Amino acid sequence: PQTNTYIEKDLSINDEIEKLRLSTTSSLLSGRRDIIVVSSVSCIYGIGNPDDFSNNVISVEIGKKINRDDLLRQLSDSLYSRNDIDFTHGKFRVKGDTLDVFPAYSDIAYRIIFWDDEIEEIDSFNPITGSRIESLSSLTLFPANIFVTSKDKIKTATNDIQLDMFKQVEY
């Protein structure tokens, strides 16, 4: 501009578009063949590594033996955030043996009930009213963010950053 005015670019993420991007990616990875992708401005931005995304998909089913804390860790690794008060997209909450998950790509939330280290019940429910929609025998949860990555890549990046930091300090 002629006035030497800097105009800051706004790179804010529209929550609804992000939800649709995650929904599309999840549907494609689930094997659905009836997906239509319509271009939007968000298409100019990259997505994460599809292998990392699919490696962070969580599958649960009634009768499956899994420690509740291990499942919570898997949810955190898939970029879900624990929030027992503000239950919104991409969050989960825990109360005793009950785990509620609100996927970032869905308007339906899911309740997983444990009996010791076994999944006893899986239900879908309306996250606003809390009313039960249906009982499920299994559930597939896709990552809460398209930029999910592996622990190995995080460790490598952390080590590289630390080495760079030490080099800068010496410099």
Task: Locate each region found by the language model.
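ASCE RecA-like P-loop NTPase motor cores
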Residues: 1-171
